[in-house]
C-alpha cells in the first residue's frame, strides 16, 4: 500500500469512512426500527381510544391542535406537565448549562431559544465564544500535558523503556484514568441517584457528554419535579462535570494522537516525501534520551591555567 498515490490514499480513507457510516446506519435501522414502530402504534392506539371515549366533549381537531401546541413547546424545552416545584428553564443554572453546551459544542438539545433575539444572540455568542474556547483549551493543554506526562517519564526511566513503549504506556494509563474517573465513576453515581436510569443509560449519557455528541434524550434531574435547591445543585454539578470531563478527554485524545503508531498512520495518508524539520523537532533517539536522564559521575573540572 506504500506505492499508492496520495489521491488514492485519500480516496481509500473516504471510502472507508462512508462504509463505516453506512454500516452504522444499517445496524441502527435494524435495532431501532421495530421499537419505534411499536411505540408509534401504541401511541396511535391510545389516542384512538381516548378520542372514542371523549368524542362528545372533545372534537378530534381540537385534540390534534392541543397536541401540536404541546409538542412545539416540548421542542423548545418547555414542559406542559404540572411540575410546579421545578423552576423555569431559563433560570441562572439552566442558562449556564445551555451556554456551556454551546461553547463545548455538546448541545444537549433539551432547551432552545424561542425569541428571534435569543437565536441571533446564540449565533453571535457561538461565533465569538468558540474560537475563544479553543484558544483556552490549547493553553490549558499546553500547561497540563507536561504535568500528566511526568509519571510516565518516571516509569520510563525506572524501567529503561524505549520512547515508543513509554509513550504507549503513558497514553494507556491516562486513558484508563479518564475512563474510570470521568466515565465509570459518574455513571455509577448517576445510576445510584437517578432511580429510573439503568447503568447502561448512565454510561450512555456520560459518553455522549464527553464525546460532545449530546443526544439530549437523557438529562439528570430534568423533568422530575425536584425541589429548586436540589435541581440547581444538579445543574451546577453537571456543568462542572462537563467542563472538567471535556478537558480530561481532550488531554487523553492529544496523548493518543502523539503516539508513533498514530503518527505513522496519519503520515501514510499525507503527501509523500522527506520529513520536514517540524516533524523532527523535539524527537530524541533512545541513546539521547538515556544520556539526558543520567547524571555525570565525574565532577566538572574548572579551567586550568598553563604552568
From Swiss-Prot:
Per the record, what ranges lie on the membrane's Cytoplasmic side?
Answer: 1-10, 141-172, 254-307
Entry coiled-coil feature ranges: none
The intramembrane stretches fall at: 92-118, 199-227
- Keywords in UniProt for this one? Glycoprotein, Ion channel, Ion transport, Membrane, Potassium, Potassium channel, Potassium transport, Transmembrane, Transmembrane helix, Transport, Voltage-gated channel
As for family, the record states:
Belongs to the two pore domain potassium channel (TC 1.A.1.8) family.
Question: Any idea what job this protein has?
Answer: Probable potassium channel subunit. No channel activity observed in vitro as protein remains in the endoplasmic reticulum. May need to associate with an as yet unknown partner in order to reach the plasma membrane.
- What's the protein called, per UniProt? Potassium channel subfamily K member 7
What organism does the UniProt record list as the source? Mus musculus (Mouse)
Q: What is the lineage of its organism?
A: Eukaryota, Metazoa, Chordata, Craniata, Vertebrata
